[in-house]
Swiss-Prot record:
Listed InterPro entries: ADH-like_C, ADH-like_N, ADH_Zn_CS, CAD-like, GroES-like_sf, NAD(P)-bd_dom_sf, PKS_ER
A Pfam match: ADH_N
Pathway(s) annotated for this protein in UniProt: Aromatic compound metabolism; phenylpropanoid biosynthesis
Gene Ontology BP terms: lignin biosynthetic process
Family: Belongs to the zinc-containing alcohol dehydrogenase family.
Reactions listed under catalytic activity: (E)-cinnamyl alcohol + NADP(+) = (E)-cinnamaldehyde + NADPH + H(+); (E)-coniferol + NADP(+) = (E)-coniferaldehyde + NADPH + H(+); (E)-sinapyl alcohol + NADP(+) = (E)-sinapaldehyde + NADPH + H(+); (E)-4-coumaroyl alcohol + NADP(+) = (E)-4-coumaraldehyde + NADPH + H(+)
UniProt-recorded name of the protein: Probable cinnamyl alcohol dehydrogenase 7/8
Residues given in the record as NADP(+) binding sites: 49, 167, 188-193, 211-216, 251, 275, 298-300
Function: Involved in lignin biosynthesis. Catalyzes the final step specific for the production of lignin monomers. Catalyzes the NADPH-dependent reduction of coniferaldehyde, 5-hydroxyconiferaldehyde, sinapaldehyde, 4-coumaraldehyde and caffeyl aldehyde to their respective alcohols.
Gene: CAD7
Known EC number: 1.1.1.195
Summary of subunit composition and partner proteins: Homodimer.
């Protein structure tokens, strides 16, 4: 991607160190190439993995860092070879903004598994410039890694679908978890988990929410539409539910035992890990081999699957439960997210902050 224009300066909210505190930061966007679109950010969701990156929990963070990978905005400019989008269209940008495009994963429409994928932030572009995310006024993104927001999908509702939504949609499609009437467990009811309930119900599955307490029971059943609720600390109820589920999607992002949940699976059942847990998890093998059960993993989704997720949710009228906040509230929102004090996703109204004025 060659340089075609002079540099442009934008403002975002960046972390300067592992304290994770976000404050205004002015920086230069990379130059627009022939296949790039410039996106003026309108909304950006907050993901738990933003906390992981901001606080350097994986030991790979670079600062200054502008987080945000659930980006919804409007196209303001396009490169000379862009055919996919027009100026004025509403678009989304998810977790990755680049890949090698030549490996088996890229050729198989699985860009998220490319070993040379480029993260939306805390990474390096092909031209050597750092990537910065959606807590900013604008972004420059290759058209291949941009998706179209359906007209009947509210923009603020679309933001969480770009990470949380596709994170559950992709394994459901890949592992065949779409047959109406099958029984699916959702372990953990946070940002990803609540989208798991909604998308699973839209596919016609019988959904059981599994949580460590009953404090979300009423909301899970009456608001999100789950069919059943299981408290993992209730040994009697867990025993009664043994071998009752076809699948479980595990969305918990911290260390936890797997054995209680493997015991809930029927023969041939699947436990699909979706949470990023930076420490070992333990289980005994008889729980797998005596029921031909399997543990699998899935990571976000491809660009094709991301567009499918948006289109599916627009068609089925699946919406995320969000709390819209301003950039001036973002540090408080992060503190609340640490305490799990959000139902169920924060979405930042970036446009209302008038960052470049």
């Amino acid at each position: 991607m060659g340089s075609l224009e002079s540099e442009r300066t934008v403002t975002g909210y960046a972390a300067r160190d592992s304290s994770g505190h976000l404050s205004p930061y002015t920086y230069t966007l990379r130059n627009k190439g022939p296949e790039d679109v410039i996106v003026r950010v309108i909304y950006c969701g907050i993901c738990h993995s933003d906390l992981v990156q901001m606080h350097n929990e994986m030991g790979m963070s670079n600062y200054p860092m502008v987080p945000g990978h659930e980006v919804v905005g409007v196209v303001t400019e396009i490169g000379s070879e862009v055919k996919k989008f027009k100026v004025g269209e509403h678009v989304g940008v998810g977790c990755i903004v680049g890949s090698c495009r030549s490996c088996s994963n890229c050729n198989g429409s699985m860009e998220q598994y490319c070993s040379k994928r480029i993260w939306t932030y805390n990474d390096v572009n092909h031209d050597g410039t750092p990537t910065q995310g959606g807590f900013a006024s604008s972004m420059v993104v290759d058209q291949m890694f941009v998706v179209r927001i359906p007209e009947n999908l509210p923009l603020e509702q679309a933001a969480p679908l770009l990470c949380a939504g596709v994170t559950v949609y992709s394994p459901m499609k890949h592992f065949g978890m779409t047959e109406p009437g099958k029984k699916c467990g959702i372990l953990g009811l946070g940002g990803v988990g609540h989208m798991g309930v909604k998308i699973a119900k839209a596919f016609g599955l019988h959904v059981t929410v599994i949580s460590s307490s009953d404090k979300k029971k009423e909301e899970a059943l009456e608001v999100l539409g789950a069919d059943a609720y299981l408290v993992s600390k209730d040994a009697e109820k867990m025993q009664e539910a043994a071998e009752s589920l076809d699948y479980i999607m595990d969305t918990i992002p911290v260390a936890h035992p797997l054995e209680p949940y493997l015991a809930l699976l029927k023969t041939n059942g699947k436990l699909v890990m979706l949470g990023v847990v930076p420490e070992p998890l333990h289980f005994v093998t008889p729980l797998l081999i005596l029921g031909r059960r399997s543990i699998a993993g899935s990571f976000i989704g491809s660009m094709e699957e991301t567009q499918e997720t948006l289109d599916f949710c627009a068609e089925k009228k699946v919406s995320s439960m969000i709390e819209v906040v301003g950039l001036d509230y973002i540090n408080t929102a992060m503190e609340r997210l640490v305490k799990n004090d959000v139902r169920y996703r924060f979405v930042v109204d970036v446009a209302a902050s008038n960052l470049d004025k």
